[in-house]
Amino acid sequence: LANGRQIEFSDKNLGSVFNNQGLKIGENKSSTLYCYPIHSSLKEKNTLLVPIAGEYRLVLADGTKIYANSGSKIRYPDVFAENERVVELEGEAYFDVAKNPARPFIVKTTQSEIKVTGTKFNITSYPDDGFEQVTLEEGSVQVKRKGEVFKLTPGRQYFLDKKSEEIVLADVDPILFTSWKDGLFRFQNMDMLNLSKKISRWYDIRFDFKDERSKKLRFSGAFDRKSSLDEFVKIMESTTDVRFKLDGNTVFISQTER
């Protein structure tokens, strides 16, 4: 929290309400945090850290809902400024922004600045990923990077390659990038390297590729995020040319020999 206090949310304090010098933070049984400002002049910033293998929903003082994926960090104020609403994201989050044309909602990442007034969209911006992407489900979004502004309409995606700094705008099916918040992994022609990063954040495991070919193999499919790691491995081995070997918290991956 802004005053240096740390609160660890768990099953032990479900339903608790914490008073943070003018801000009440409550958690319900669906792992949703609610922020209730007591003093409208308080503009300190708090940080929500979502652990690996975890996820949280956050309802801000203005009514905006944020679904934060595992391994993510979100900084947000107790109370927004009068002319804008600014939060900072590192990781992945889905935003359902409360409409307020007079106070645009701005998400800052290490790469870009995403500006909306009221809409639904997903941002993926993990430090260890080689890309950043913004996927719009509803409304409109402006992505600003190094002086350039990119406007998105529903079903469009902004994709930044961090290494080459190439930016691609494309038509996509938003559900492929937002279904995680509803408890479902969806992949469409995704290479094993990027797929392994998503899986490792959820199951808190490490992937070790035995050869470069395995990293480039692609997978399309869906499975429940509540599935065990063993169930995930069975699904992957039955539908791909990949062999998985689990040793402790490390999964060794190699291509099946034909």
Feature locations, PLM:
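A residue-level detector for the "anchor" residue at the start of short, highly conserved motifs
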Residues: L1-R258
